[in-house]
Amino acid sequence: MNLYKRGLVVGKFCPLHQGHELLIKRAQDACEELLVVSYTRPEFPGYEPARRERWLRAQFPQAHIVVLDDARLAALCAARGVPARHLPHNDDDGELHRHFMGWLCWTVLALPVDAVFTSEDYGPGFAQVLERHYAGGPVAHVSVDQARAQVPVSGTLVRQDPHAHSAFLSPIVCADFVTRVCVLGGESSGKTTLAQALAAHFETAWVAEYGRELWESQDGILNYDDLLKIGREQLRREAQALLAARRWLFCDTSPMTTYFYCVEMFGKAEQELARLAEHRYDLVLLCAPDFPFIQDGTRRDEDFRARQHAWYQAELARRGIAFVNVSGSVDERVRQVAQVLAARMPC
């Protein structure tokens, strides 16, 4: 039997870490309903409301999730016919934050609580303020791992270097901090070899080219409808690989390549495939066609490779996508990419 009717957990969740998850799970176990509120002012880059909401909803689908910025708060106030307020600043007095939450739960959300769960020393005072706002009964405070003995981490610590503290993050949260690197290139330009070599060098995951896998499974025959299937499956596998990647994910091809082949083979492409081809990466590598051309029975010829390489150059420029040219041997290419990635890492 649940001890409380409706519990409350409040936090920035920038990012959502295992300490937060422990707190929310304990609250869920003790309550019939749970209200989870996230806000921060100012926002932290990379921890936008939509992202925080996605994490919370994925991990706690049964909870009532409210993630706020000033615009979202204004919309809630308008829907209730309540004069809008601004979110309190993170540096404002704690009492102001507590009264803000009392107003939010009672006046804006109409969701009074009878318990608040925290890992902070302000918890008892928070419960007292909420109780005064509701005037409908006591509000209990439940402390969870205040000493950080079970989960020795904080949001401030994780923000300094999410990768160094990835053990305290769920895979869905870690995935949003992975740098996605796409490797493009014409046929027999070494892109698959490079993607594999980079994954081995950086001890992380890579995503193979699904189109080739399907082509081989269908005895070298691809139909028009297969190309959209390839684009969808390539991105599905990419999203799955993000959950296992460490800092970087290397992708052998992208839906833009699938789009190229669809138009090349059939003279047209579905609108959905064109949209999938807009999928963006954090870094794009374009392999120079300076490898000896190897005919493995699936490829065309060197002239086609050169034309495909030129198409990539023109199409990336047309889409406003910056890219890094890589050339030389596999080892030389790995060194080139390592230098680029090192320059992108925080000091």
Language-model features and meaning:
Residues 190:
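Conserved glycine(s) of the Walker
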